[in-house]
Swiss-Prot record:
Main localization category: membrane
Sites carrying sugar chains: 48
Name the UniProt record assigns to this protein: Ammonium transporter Rh type C
Gene3D superfamilies with a match to the protein in the record: Ammonium transporter AmtB like domains
One GO biological process term: ammonium transmembrane transport
Organism name: Oryctolagus cuniculus (Rabbit)
Length: 467
C-alpha cells in the first residue's frame, strides 16, 4: 500500500507549532548580550572602552557572514547534484537551517551562555548556532532524497539538542580543543546521519536508481556549492578561535590543507579512472576534505607543511572512499549514503581527530609544538593527558552520535511522516509543485511544432554518490 505523501496539514501544523514554541521560549529566556543591548554605552564607561569598534560585533561579524554563506548557500548548492532533486536540496536545506539556528540558540544557550537563567544573545551565539546547523546539514546529506520535510524537521530538532549536549561535554567538561569542529561538527553529523540512513534502509531503492544520477547542469550547480564552501572554510575553522595568533594560525592551516586536498583529489580521480578522466563527484567533494581534516588541529602549532600533509592524506582517502567504500557500505552494510558524507566528513573527521590528539600529546611547554601552554587549561593538565582527553572526546562523540541516530531512525521509520515510496525517491514533484514550460501565447496551445523537439538530456556521467 502506498504511503500518503500529502503534507497539506502535517507540514504546516508542525512548522507553526515549532515557530510558536520558539517565540514563547525566546520571550521567556533570551535577552541581548551587553554588546548588543542599549546599555552598551554604560558598559563602555565601566570598562573604560573608548570606541564602539571594540564591540565584539566588529571582530566576529566577518567570520559570521562567511559561516552563514557556507550553511545556507554552500551546503545547499552542494546537494543539488541530483538531476531531479534541486528544489528539495536547496529548499529543505533552507527550511531545516532556519529551524536549526533558532533551536540551537536556545539549546546552546542553556548549556553555555546562561546568566540568571537567561540566555544573553550576541554575535558568538549566532556563529555557534550556524556551526551546529552545519552538522545538521552534514547529516541531511546521508538521507537526501529519501525522507519527507516533516521527517527532516523532526530530525533537525532532535539532532540540535543532542549536538548541544555533546558539544558541552567535549568543550566545557572535557576541555577538548576542536576549533574547526572535526569532532563536534563533522564526526557527529556524519555518524548520526549514517546511523539514521542505516535504520531507514530501503530495500527497493534501485527502482529510483535513474534519478540518483547527475546531468550536466546539476553538476555545475553542485560545483558552485563546492566553491562557496572551499573559499569560506578558513573562516569556518577560525571563527571561534581566540583573537590574535590562534585565529590567524587556524586560517593559515585551513588554507594550506584545502589547497593540498585539491591537487590530491584531482590526481587520485584521474588515476582511478581507466581512461584517466576526472569524475565531477570527486572534485565536488574530496577537494573539501582538507578543511574537515585540519579542523581539530586548526589553531594548534601544526606548521604549514603539517597542514599540507593533512590535506594531502584527506584528499586521497576521500577520493578512494567514493570509488570503493561507498559501494561497499551499501551492498554489505546496508548504508545508503546519498551524498557520500562518510567520505567527505566521516573519514576526514576521524583523521582530523587523530591529528589533533597526536599534536596535543606532543605539545611543548614553550608552545613551539602543539598548544597546551599557549592556550592554557584548568586542572593543570599536561600535554599527554590532554592528548588522551582528545581521543576520549572522539570515542564519546561516536557513541552519542550512533545511539542518537538509532533512536531517531526508529522514530522516523514510522509510516505516517509523509515519506515517499522507494520508487518515488529523489523526485521534486512529490513535495513541490512543478511548473512546466508553457507557450507564451494562450492561443498557441494547439499549435504543433514544425520541427522535431530537442532530445531529452541524458546523464553525462554514470558516477553517483551512492552507486
Amino acid at each position: 500500500m502506498a504511503w500518503n505523501t500529502n503534507l497539506r496539514w502535517r507540514l504546516p501544523l508542525l512548522c507553526l507549532v515549532l515557530e510558536v514554541a520558539m517565540v514563547v521560549l525566546f520571550g521567556l529566556f533570551v535577552r541581548y548580550s551587553p554588546d548588543a543591548d542599549s546599555s552598551w554605552s554604560n558598559e563602555k564607561r565601566k570598562g573604560n572602552i573608548t570606541s564602539d569598534l571594540e564591540n565584539e560585533f566588529y571582530y566576529r561579524y566577518p567570520s559570521f557572514q562567511d559561516v552563514h554563506v557556507m550553511v545556507f548557500l554552500g551546503f545547499g548548492f552542494l546537494m543539488t547534484f541530483l538531476q531531479r532533486y534541486g528544489y528539495c536540496a536547496l529548499g529543505f536545506n533552507f527550511l531545516l537551517a532556519a529551524l536549526g539556528v533558532q533551536w540551537a540558540l536556545l539549546m546552546q544557550g542553556w548549556f553555555q551562555y546562561t546568566k540568571d537563567r537567561l540566555i544573553l544573545l550576541g554575535i558568538k551565539n549566532l556563529i555557534d548556532a550556524d556551526s551546529c546547523v552545519a552538522s545538521v546539514c552534514v547529516a541531511f546529506g546521508a538521507v537526501l532524497g529519501k525522507v519527507s520535510p516533516v521527517q527532516m524537521l523532526l530530525m533537525t530538532f532532535f539532532q540540535v539538542a543532542l549536538f548541544s549536549a555533546n558539544e558541552f561535554l567535549l568543550l566545557h567538561v572535557l576541555e577538548v580543543k576542536d576549533a574547526g569542529g572535526s569532532i563536534t561538527i563533522h564526526i557527529f553529523g556524519a555518524y548520526f546521519g549514517l546511523t539514521v540512513t542505516w535504520i531507514l534502509y530501503r530495500h527497493n531503492l534501485d527502482h529510483s536508481r535513474e534519478r540518483q544520477s547527475s546531468v550536466y547542469h546539476s553538476n555545475l550547480f553542485a560545483m558552485i556549492g563546492t566553491l562557496f564552501l572551499w573559499i569560506y572554510w578558513p573562516s569556518f575553522n577560525s571563527a571561534m578561535s581566540n583573537y590574535g595568533d590562534a585565529q590567524h594560525r587556524a586560517a593559515i592551516n585551513t588554507y594550506c590543507s584545502l589547497a593540498a586536498s585539491v591537487l590530491t583529489s584531482v590526481a587520485m580521480s584521474s588515476v582511478l579512472h581507466k581512461k584517466g578522466k576526472l569524475d565531477m563527484v570527486h572534485i565536488q567533494n574530496a577537494t573539501l576534505a582538507g578543511g574537515v581534516g585540519v579542523g581539530t588541529a586548526a589553531e594548534m602549532m601544526l606548521m604549514p607543511y603539517g597542514a599540507l600533509i593533512v590535506g594531502f592524506i584527506c584528499g586521497a582517502v576521500s577520493t578512494l572512499g567514493f570509488v570503493y567504500l561507498t559501494p561497499f557500505l551499501e551492498s554489505r552494510l546496508r548504508i545508503q549514503d546519498t551524498c557520500g558524507i562518510h567520505n567527505l566528513h566521516g573519514i576526514p573527521g576521524l583523521i582530523g581527530a587523530i591529528v589533533g590528539a597526536v599534536t596535543a600529546a606532543y605539545a611543548s611547554p614553550d608552545g613551539d609544538r602543539g598548544f597546551v601552554y599557549p592556550f592554557g587549561f584548568h586542572n593543570e593538565k599536561d600535554e599527554k593527558v590532554q592528548g588522551r582527553f582528545q581521543a576520549f572526546g572522539l570515542l564519546l562523540t561516536l557513541a552519542i552520535a550512533m545511539v542518537g541516530g538509532t533512536i531517531m531512525g526508529l522514530i522516523l521509520k514510522l509510516p505516517f511522516w509523509g515519506q515517499a515510496m522507494d520508487e518515488d525517491c529523489f523526485d521534486d514533484s512529490i513535495y513541490w509543485e512543478m511548473h512546466e514550460e508553457k507557450s507564451s501565447s494562450p492561443e498557441d496551445h494547439t499549435h504543433k511544432p514544425s520541427v522535431p523537439t530537442e532530445p531529452v538530456e541524458q546523464p553525462t556521467s554514470s558516477a553517483t554518490l551512492a552507486p
